[in-house]
Amino acid sequence: GAGAAGNSTIGVSAGGYSLQSSIGYFVFSSSGGQSDFGDLQQKQWLPFGVSNNIRGVFGGAYYATDYSAPFNANGFSDFIQFATKGDASNFGVRVPTYASASINSSTRGIYAGGVQRYPGTSGGGSPSYDNQDAVTYMRKIEMATLGEEEHFGELSFSGGYAMGVSSSTRGCIGGRGGNKHGSSQVNTIEFVTIATQGNPTDFGDLTDARGAGASCSSSVRGVFMGGNNPSGSTNIIDFITIATTGNATDFGDLLSVEKWFQGCSDVHGGLGD
């Protein structure tokens, strides 16, 4: 349930299940647990994370104030500077969804799909967690610019808990969760060219219809891990070659079944090729 981001040296997780404000980090080249980085502006669950080598941005979370109806949270977005440990600062964008997939280049971050958090924004919304509306829209932010976002395009399916992988030029969105909100799992993978706004194009299929899994990528390959399929949580790992279209291929298995978790890498699209 945490958001994940990373540069070429450290990986960072922010927020988490049952609502947490903590930000932790680990060094990719070393084994071991996390160390304290700082705190988010408020407790969050299921934020997206995008990053380049300088900055990580988190947004689109389920907030502590969301547990009481009607929803009144402000849709905060946070950012950190990887080189400077400390609390997150306000990025200045109001994000109306949670459980969105995310992709990015070194200059642009995109969040896609998700579940509407509160009324009064495009797609509606409901003060009941079980009945909130899944959405199709994709929104972009510029990593170096605070307080600005813009419509990017529309997925072919609505829903939260999809998984995103990207090179520096192309982003792929795979799967969809079937946890509440009237949506079943899908195996669809779609892609966009990150520099060009527009609707995504069909890429292929995952090996299994699922969502709420983790994902990570290099400049060449995207990997989807675990998640929730119609039978329950799974340990499946599959991968795609980002530059070419086609169905995902089996990679192996996680040590245990997992869902509602995130992945990051030290060679993703936000760091260039």
Regions inferred by a protein language model and the residue ranges of each:
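Polar, enzyme-active/binding microenvironments
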Residues: 1-273
